[in-house]
Amino acid sequence: MIMATITLKGNSIHTAGELPAVGSQLPAFTLVKSDLSEVSPADFAGKKLVLNIFPSLDTAVCAASVRRFNKEAGERGDAVVLCISADLPFAQGRFCTTEGLDNVVPLSVYRSPEFGLDYGLTITDGPLKGLLSRAVIVTDASGKVLYAEQVPEIVQEPDYDKALAALA
């Protein structure tokens, strides 16, 4: 099985699978919105996407990434930002409502454990085993991957500048 090695506070942990390659088509998925409806990439057809993927909104770095992408999406308006985690849809909805974040679409993988494997992001060992690692994937309007970053240290934020530059 293909694995990536990343770190959590300097300690090595692993993920199963492989991050989608730049130039490939975004793998299919079915994820759950905060109203419990299901969505897939087809629901965003014709739009550029930023997939902001992370372990849980209940961590400072994950919450910071959602706030930052919400701000950037509001200023740009040229892409849909999907914030994807294993948090339950209720918690995601509450977080976004409380924080006033209305420029991102929170999505839960709780019904779709295969998402993490298909995207190479399921953590397979260590204290966060079973959650998703931190990554950002950017696609064009046809679903072609333009940028993919699996953040090498989970407690670090993604490279926002590179991700947003891929939208240009």
Swiss-Prot record:
GO terms for molecular function: thioredoxin peroxidase activity. It comes from the Bacteria. Disulfide bonds join 62-96. The active site is at residue 62. Its EC number is 1.11.1.24. Pfam families: Redoxin (PF08534). Keywords: Antioxidant, Disulfide bond, Oxidoreductase, Peroxidase, Redox-active center. Residues 20-168 form the Thioredoxin domain. InterPro entries: Redoxin (IPR013740), Thioredoxin-like_sf (IPR036249), Thioredoxin_domain (IPR013766), TPX (IPR002065), Tpx_CS (IPR018219), Tpx_Peroxidase_subfamily (IPR050455). It catalyses: a hydroperoxide + [thioredoxin]-dithiol = an alcohol + [thioredoxin]-disulfide + H2O. Homodimer. The active site is a conserved redox-active cysteine residue, the peroxidatic cysteine (C(P)), which makes the nucleophilic attack on the peroxide substrate. The peroxide oxidizes the C(P)-SH to cysteine sulfenic acid (C(P)-SOH), which then reacts with another cysteine residue, the resolving cysteine (C(R)), to form a disulfide bridge. The disulfide is subsequently reduced by an appropriate electron donor to complete the catalytic cycle. In this atypical 2-Cys peroxiredoxin, C(R) is present in the same subunit to form an intramolecular disulfide. Belongs to the peroxiredoxin family. Tpx subfamily. Thiol-specific peroxidase that catalyzes the reduction of hydrogen peroxide and organic hydroperoxides to water and alcohols, respectively. Plays a role in cell protection against oxidative stress by detoxifying peroxides. This is Thiol peroxidase. It comes from Chlorobaculum tepidum (strain ATCC 49652 / DSM 12025 / NBRC 103806 / TLS) (Chlorobium tepidum).
